[in-house]
Amino acid sequence: DYLEIVKRKTASLFHTGARVGAYLAGAAPSLIDETDRYGLNMGIAFQMIDDILDVVGHPDLLGKPTGMDLRDGNPALPIILAIRNGDLAVQQAFDCGTPSEPQVFAALSAIKAGSCIQEARTLSRRYAREALVSLKRFPPSKYRDGLESLVQLIIDRDF
């Protein structure tokens, strides 16, 4: 399952960093729990945006060509959504293990032409909102403002 993979990998890094930061700052246990939720949801949103950028990002700004998830056989969110929506070009490119460049191009074009990118952005925003909700239990401060800004930076990341 996509979310379980993301939770165990990318989101766990955000989760752990947020938890350790709250602990070292002397936060109350209930606030540490909220920080857990913040980090987990922010990490999920980050990975979803990263998956989107692998399709629509600019290679020079990303530092790598687009379509690497497809080439490497990684089940990135736009790929999963395209396959669920019945896109045969994406399904074939993903299933073959080592897609040719024409297959990658066709699959990426199909993903861009469909609704998958918008669906993935909507999902990423949902997790970003959940991260922000977790911060509302913290008293207003420049630190909370900074954590809120990080969420917005992740969502607005556009290469």
Regions found by a protein language model. Give the residues of each.
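All-alpha prenyltransferase/terpene-synthase fold signal
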Residues: 1-159
